[in-house]
Amino acid sequence: MKKVVLLSLCFLFFVVFCSSKAFAIDLYGFGSYWDQDDTEGTWGGGIGLNIQLFTEHLRLDGRAYLFEDNDIGHDGDLSITPFDLGLQVHILPSATVDPYILGGVSYIYADSDRFEVDSTVSGYVGIGLDVNLGIPLVKLFGEAIYRAAELDRKIGEDIDASGFTGNVGLKLLF
């Protein structure tokens, strides 16, 4: 239920605050690796949507990840699913190679079958690069993101899920 409410609020935010003269939408999918401090790194993927705000340099960005379960030793597996909402500032939006910075907030849904853990809100910052492939409406992108996140356990030590995330994928431009 929390996921549905969060995604509905994100969608409403996109609709209300995304009025620009050239309404540009990017849909994208990506592969991802998240190297966390207290758990083993994990592979996953995700989907996202970003919308131009006020100028071609500023974009509102929303994304959802799906990672495989994290092995945390004798305590079993931990399932972590981040939902991000943030901004991207593109340096050279019309160039073949467009560097950008990004940052925002994340709702991190956490679950384990062996212990109780609370989901949390955290933040992230990063850099990215869009590369025009010469194919109409398609771009390749890569990102390096640092996510600060600590998950509260009911019993025992908290889990520090902070760490770097690398994303590589394709954007479809509309």
Protein language model regions, located:
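Gram-negative (and chloroplast) outer-membrane scaffold detector with strong preference
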Residues: 48-123, 131-140, 172
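Bacterial N-terminal signal peptides
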Residues: 8-16
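Sec/Tat signal peptide C-region and signal peptidase I cleavage site
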Residues: 17-24
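Outer-membrane beta-barrel porins/channels
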Residues: 138, 142, 147-152, 157
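Outer-membrane beta-barrel "beta-signal"
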Residues: 161-174
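Solvent-exposed loop/turn segments connecting transmembrane beta-strands
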Residues: 34-43, 72-77, 112-118, 154-160
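Positively charged n-region of N-terminal signal peptides that target proteins for export
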Residues: 1-4
